[in-house]
Amino acid sequence: MSAHDPHASLARPAAKAWHARLELGFERQPGGRTALAHRRHVGPLRVQRALYPEGDAICHAVIVHPPGGVAGGDRLEIDVKLDAGTHAVLTTPGATKWYKSNGLDARQRIDIDVGARAKLDWLPQNNLFFDATHASLEFVLKLGDGASVLGWDAAQLGRQAAGEAWSTGSVASFSKIVGPSGRALWVERARLDARDPLRAAPQGLGGFPVYGTLWALGPACTNALAESIAPALPFDDALRAGVTCIAPGTMLIRALAHSMEALQHLFAEQWLALRPIVHGIDAKPLRLWQT
């Protein structure tokens, strides 16, 4: 990416802000096929056609946002529902770029409902926050009885490839995972300001510009599993990771890094290792990752 990327200071007038919404619904058909039965979009947020590289039981779909990035005043809303017994793999083709603010916040809301005994692999590319971004992100995931989920969220502050630091701006985030009983299994609310000392503090980001969380959810996610993973996780000046089983069936791997490539590689490795345990299904690298 060039240091003269014209999107770095994109200031779209509020009247031209995008309000995009995408609804996806997966249902189980006779014979065990997972079908993308409901698909509705408003604005420039949509999904490419359903793919079946692993056979009919697992539906793969790629969510795309054609303009390529999110500017001040934009609102993105994604609602996903997996019916009982379905299995979906959702990803994105590239990083979501959050451009310099025009004075308005850019907002994203994602709501996912995973039905009983359904399986979800939520594998988006990372968020890339440009300098002077003002963004607000909300993520809510609901689990049905016997459901399992592997997914992640990763972010980078500033465009390192362009030599750009994240010196001004703010990112507000809210994440919530809700169990079958309706009880929250994990809730995290954070507001990160570019000038906050917490960015450099050991109890914060420790000076790392890249951070992320991988969550593994389901009956197989136990303290014993977390303890078996922990010794192999890196903890050095380039990449630091730790794992915790915060509640029965809820395991988190948190990571800090100096490069997004290193963090993505770690999360992809963990997904490949965890999928047979959490979903009971072998894993292969997504074809999209290899392009």
Curated annotation (Swiss-Prot):
Pfam families: UreD. Signal peptide: none annotated. GO terms for molecular function: nickel cation binding. GO terms for cellular component: cytoplasm. Its main location: cytoplasm. InterPro entries: UreD. It comes from the Bacteria. The keyword Chaperone applies. It is found in: Cytoplasm. Keywords: Chaperone, Cytoplasm, Nickel insertion. Belongs to the UreD family. UreD, UreF and UreG form a complex that acts as a GTP-hydrolysis-dependent molecular chaperone, activating the urease apoprotein by helping to assemble the nickel containing metallocenter of UreC. The UreE protein probably delivers the nickel. Required for maturation of urease via the functional incorporation of the urease nickel metallocenter. This is Urease accessory protein UreD. It comes from Burkholderia thailandensis (strain ATCC 700388 / DSM 13276 / CCUG 48851 / CIP 106301 / E264). The lineage of its organism: Bacteria, Pseudomonadati, Pseudomonadota, Betaproteobacteria, Burkholderiales.
